[in-house]
């Protein structure tokens, strides 16, 4: 009985590590962000930013207004870079190409990356903190 309990304790951290979000989850978060924007679900898109949207640098109203002239948008998210770690925090960069069509028909193409952030499991009481969230964006227009 004691052996089974000891083995369960040893296996528990391994199981927790297996459930941690990985690089593909970060890429999926960027794709989910643009899917939400495309369907006009700006509340969900805003919520994918770190700190409940605050990391976007905008209020929700300003964030939503920023897409007022956008008819369509899509993202091509490439393979994320290496995960960086520090003090129970994780960061990862996802390279992207973003394509937008404005309501006036003008097309835009941006290239750059999103940096995503998460907290390792067990550090925050809020389980949502362990999922990837957008932390910053570096996008430049492609001519």
Outline where the language-model segments fall:
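Short, low-complexity N-terminal intrinsically disordered segments enriched in polar/charged residues
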Residues: 17-39, 47
């Amino acid at each position: 009985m004691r052996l089974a309990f000891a083995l369960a304790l040893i296996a528990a951290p391994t199981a927790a590590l297996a459930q941690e979000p990985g690089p593909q989850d970060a890429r999926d978060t960027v794709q989910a962000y643009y899917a939400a924007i495309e369907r006009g679900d700006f509340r969900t898109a805003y919520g994918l930013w770190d700190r409940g949207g605050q990391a976007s640098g905008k209020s929700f109203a300003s964030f939503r207004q920023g897409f007022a002239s956008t008819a369509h948008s899509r993202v091509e998210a490439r393979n994320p870079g290496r995960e960086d770690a520090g003090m129970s925090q994780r960061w990862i960069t996802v390279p992207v190409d973003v394509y937008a069509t404005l309501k006036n028909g003008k097309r835009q193409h941006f290239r750059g990356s999103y940096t995503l952030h998460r907290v390792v499991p067990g550090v925050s009481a809020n389980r949502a903190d362990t999922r990837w969230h957008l932390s910053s964006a570096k996008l430049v227009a492609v001519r």
